[in-house]
C-alpha cells in the first residue's frame, strides 16, 4: 500500500478521460472547459510529514493549496470556486473532499503501476486522469 511520501514528486498528465463532463457537472462554463481540456498540467505534491501541498502547474494557470491531513480548510479551485475541503490519507490513497453551495466532489489520488491516478467524482460523473512521474 502506498504512503503519502510515495505520492511526493512532479507528475505530468499523460491521459485524461471524462474531464469535460466532470467540469460541466462541477459548473465550469464552456470557455473555461475548453481551456481546461487543452491544458496538460504537472501536479507537484510535497509533504513535510505534517503538511501537504498540491500544486497544479500548466502554461495556462497555476493553482496551489496546502493543508494538514484531516483538517478542513478553504480552497480556491482553478475555476474560482471557494470550497470547504478536507484531505485524508486512507487505504493508500489521498482523498480530497470538497463542499460548496450544497454540492460536493471527491478527488482521489493513488499510485497504480508507478503512475499517479487521479479520479474526480461528482454525483454520477467520474473523470480519470493519469500522470507519470517526471522527477
Curated annotation (Swiss-Prot):
Residues with N-acetylalanine modification: 2
User: Which residues are the signal sequence here?
Assistant: none
Disulphide-bonded residues: 120-127
> Which residues are recorded as binding hexadecanoate?
131
Report where it is expressed, by tissue.
Answer: Most abundant in lens and retina (found in the mueller cells), moderately abundant in heart and testis (found in the Sertoli cells), and present in very low amounts in lung.
The residues listed in the UniProt record as binding N-eicosanoyl ethanolamine, with positions renumbered to this chain, are 43, 109, 131
Per UniProt, which keywords does this protein have? Acetylation, Cytoplasm, Disulfide bond, Lipid transport, Lipid-binding, Nucleus, Phosphoprotein, Secreted, Synapse, Transport
**Where does the record place it?**
Cytoplasm; Nucleus; Synapse; Postsynaptic density
Map motif Nuclear localization signal onto the chain.
Answer: 24-34
Q: Which residues carry this modification: N6-acetyllysine?
A: 17
Q: Which Pfam families match?
A: Lipocalin (PF00061)
Among SUPFAM superfamilies, the record links this protein to: Lipocalins
* Biological process terms in GO annotation: fatty acid transport; glucose homeostasis; glucose metabolic process; lipid transport across blood-brain barrier; negative regulation of D-glucose transmembrane transport; phosphatidylcholine biosynthetic process; positive regulation of cold-induced thermogenesis; positive regulation of peroxisome proliferator activated receptor signaling pathway
Q: What is known of its domains?
A: Forms a beta-barrel structure that accommodates hydrophobic ligands in its interior.
What the protein does comes down to: Intracellular carrier for long-chain fatty acids and related active lipids, such as endocannabinoids, that regulate the metabolism and actions of the ligands they bind. In addition to the cytosolic transport, selectively delivers specific fatty acids from the cytosol to the nucleus, wherein they activate nuclear receptors. Delivers retinoic acid to the nuclear receptor peroxisome proliferator-activated receptor delta; which promotes proliferation and survival. May also serve as a synaptic carrier of endocannabinoid at central synapses and thus controls retrograde endocannabinoid signaling.
The entry assigns this protein to a family as follows:
Belongs to the calycin superfamily. Fatty-acid binding protein (FABP) family.
What name appears for this protein in its UniProt entry?
Answer: Fatty acid-binding protein 5
Organism of provenance: Bos taurus
Lineage, highest ranks first: Eukaryota, Metazoa, Chordata, Craniata, Vertebrata
What gene name does this entry carry? FABP5
Amino acid at each position: 500500500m502506498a504512503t503519502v511520501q510515495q505520492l511526493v514528486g512532479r507528475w505530468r498528465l499523460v491521459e485524461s478521460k471524462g474531464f469535460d463532463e466532470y467540469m460541466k457537472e462541477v459548473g465550469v462554463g464552456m470557455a473555461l472547459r475548453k481551456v481546461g481540456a487543452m491544458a496538460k498540467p504537472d501536479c507537484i505534491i510535497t509533504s513535510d510529514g505534517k503538511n501537504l501541498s498540491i500544486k497544479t502547474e500548466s502554461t495556462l494557470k497555476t493553482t496551489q493549496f496546502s493543508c494538514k491531513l484531516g483538517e478542513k480548510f478553504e480552497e480556491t479551485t482553478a475555476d474560482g470556486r471557494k470550497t470547504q475541503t478536507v484531505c485524508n490519507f486512507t487505504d493508500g490513497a489521498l482523498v480530497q473532499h470538497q463542499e460548496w453551495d450544497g454540492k460536493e466532489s471527491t478527488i482521489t489520488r493513488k499510485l497504480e503501476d508507478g503512475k499517479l491516478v487521479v479520479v474526480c467524482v461528482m454525483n454520477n460523473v467520474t473523470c480519470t486522469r493519469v500522470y507519470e512521474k517526471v522527477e
